[in-house]
Amino acid sequence: MINYNFRNRTSFPEDFLKKANVIKQIQNRFYTYGYDQIETPLFEDYDMYSNVQGTVQQDDMVKVIHSSGRVLVLRPDVTIPITRQYVETDMTSHYQRFSYCLDIFRFNETQQAYRTQAGVEFFGDESPEADAEVIALAIDSLKDLKIAPFKIEIGHSGIYKELLEQANLTDQEQQTLHALIQSKNISETSSFLDHLSIDQDLKQKIELIPMLYGDPSTVIKRAQAIVTNETMQQVVDTLFNVYSLLKDDQIEEYISFNLGLINNMNYYSGIIFQGFTEQIGQPILMGGRYDHLSSQFENEIPAVGFAFEIDKLLTLITPGDQPLITQADFLIEYQPNCRQDALLLARRLRQANKKVIIQPTESSSKIKASNIILVDSNSYQLKSSDIQTTFSSIDQTLQHVLKKR
């Protein structure tokens, strides 16, 4: 029996603020690239996902029964509903850039049943410039978060697909070969291919796939050696053009190629990429080109995108990379006979959109605040990291603290 992980995630204030800050930085970067934020429904018809091939496994979806008897699912994916909505509107005549930050829900034996993703979808443009744009956006977002070191591994499904067609393998043989190539198990791959009825030249080309990784220029040269038709040549040309654009953008230091990156081949139709850091053995972002997904909604439109795994990013954020987490902008403490003045000061600060906590001086509560104001019968004493001074009135106090900020 499989025990799925349904742990509740309660985000306490410091964790919530840390996550909110990461999301805000990512959303700000998405905005600077021209991506407009959208949202998809939390509940969707089960049929929409079950009828789309090569995407979400049916057993992974969290299903619920509507009072009408319809089977619904909690959102297991964002790209599919965005693609459907785009196809069903009149927006398909022009390029469209969307961004999102949403929770997705899937059964998983080892992870929580839901997680947060932030990503983008770029519809209508099949050019290498579009591929390079979303990769550059991913890189800039990671740089904003001061996550280092990291690498974006870029692959392409085209060459491997062409070799598979020539090999004419069964579904089971393809699955076995996929697993061996993705794990870069060279010896087992060779042994497995030896037992198949394929010619020696094709076998050698397939064996090269897991070794085509590393420096992009080197990988492109080595990939050229196994090109046998125009389709494969177009793949190499696409990789060359995308890398040239990334070099023009002066971000090639973050790029490596991996033509053994062949996951979700039924979903991705071209460029595939993943983001990795040394600290985590799993991708912190995944993306690629999925030009054929929209055809399952009866209108084929080129598209490329990616999504960050926010919860994985949070494990990489160090305290020094985040703003100081405090419980309040101002802590107002007051003597018993000065409560009215303290309440008035708190109200004025809150009207200026400041976060304020107020308590009597004898309170034992320990509050972390950027500024402390002690209100007694004759003065307002301000204590902050860079100043300690006394004012004679509320107006004088407000004039100083609000002007300063």
From Swiss-Prot:
The gene is hisZ. GO terms for cellular component: cytoplasm. It comes from Oceanobacillus iheyensis (strain DSM 14371 / CIP 107618 / JCM 11309 / KCTC 3954 / HTE831). Required for the first step of histidine biosynthesis. May allow the feedback regulation of ATP phosphoribosyltransferase activity by histidine. Heteromultimer composed of HisG and HisZ subunits. GO terms for molecular function: catalytic activity, acting on a protein; histidine-tRNA ligase activity; transferase activity. This function is generally fulfilled by the C-terminal part of HisG, which is missing in some bacteria such as this one. HAMAP family: HisZ. InterPro entries: aa-tRNA-synth_II/BPL/LPL, HisRS-like_core, HisRS/HisZ, HisZ. Disulfide bonds: none annotated. The keyword Amino-acid biosynthesis applies. Keywords: Amino-acid biosynthesis, Cytoplasm, Histidine biosynthesis. It comes from the Bacteria. This is ATP phosphoribosyltransferase regulatory subunit. It is found in: Cytoplasm. Pathway: Amino-acid biosynthesis; L-histidine biosynthesis; L-histidine from 5-phospho-alpha-D-ribose 1-diphosphate: step 1/9. Belongs to the class-II aminoacyl-tRNA synthetase family. HisZ subfamily. One of its GO terms (biological process) is histidyl-tRNA aminoacylation.
